[in-house]
């Protein structure tokens, strides 16, 4: 029974630690995600206006069709990932997934913008680029949030490890009580 009490005290001290002040609040994260999603939603209708099959018929590489399809899928994945992160902003995996989805979309979108500029309409390409550029600030904020969240999680693990070591030491130093 005594060992259980010591273990409970150790766990309570670990979970009673205050979070690092470097990580954005949940409200700030949700606000940033709402802005990110609003900008991303603007891309969908513009991507729908693109006709990469026509580009290919006019001599463009067939890869543009694949990249356009990939960009549309990545846009959907980004929305889903951002929704998941908004529901659980403390989840490092969700934050990383959202950041990686955003980077993948930006990478693919760059090629689609180039194709749009060359084979369809430079004004549409400029519009896509402007909307994607408006999300650069959100991408930077998300990246900083991921870094801060990872540092916080690493600190929490260090505290838990130190407390576990202290508890093990405390338990191993106790003398066994004889039976009465």
Question: What residue ranges belong to the model's regions?
Answer:
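Sec-dependent N-terminal signal peptides
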Residues: 3-13
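A near-ubiquitous, low-amplitude feature marking generic local secondary-structure context
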Residues: 6, 19, 23-26, 30, ...
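Boundary at the C-terminal end of the N-terminal hydrophobic targeting segment
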Residues: 14-18
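C-terminal amphipathic alpha-helix
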Residues: 21-54, 116-180
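Alpha-helical segments in soluble extracytoplasmic regions
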Residues: 36-103, 108
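Surface-exposed, polar helix/loop patches in the mature regions of secreted/periplasmic/lumenal proteins
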Residues: 83-139
């Amino acid at each position: 029974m005594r060992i259980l009490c010591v273990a409970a005290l150790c766990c309570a001290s670990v979970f009673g630690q205050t979070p690092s002040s470097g990580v954005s609040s949940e409200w700030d994260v949700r606000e940033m995600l709402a802005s990110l999603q609003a900008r991303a939603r603007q891309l969908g209708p513009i991507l729908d206006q693109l006709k990469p099959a026509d580009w290919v018929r006019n001599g463009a590489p067939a890869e543009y069709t694949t990249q356009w399809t990939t960009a549309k899928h990545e846009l959907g994945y980004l929305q889903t990932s951002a929704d998941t992160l908004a529901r659980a902003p403390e989840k490092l995996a969700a934050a990383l997934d959202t950041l990686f989805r955003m980077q993948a979309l930006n990478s693919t979108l760059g090629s689609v913008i180039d194709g749009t500029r060359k084979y369809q309409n430079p004004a549409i390409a400029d519009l896509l680029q402007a909307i994607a550029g408006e999300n650069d600030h959100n991408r930077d904020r998300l990246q900083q949030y991921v870094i801060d969240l990872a540092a916080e999680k690493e600190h929490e693990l260090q505290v838990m490890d130190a407390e576990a070591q202290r508890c093990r030491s405390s338990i191993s130093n106790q003398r066994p009580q004889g039976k009465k």
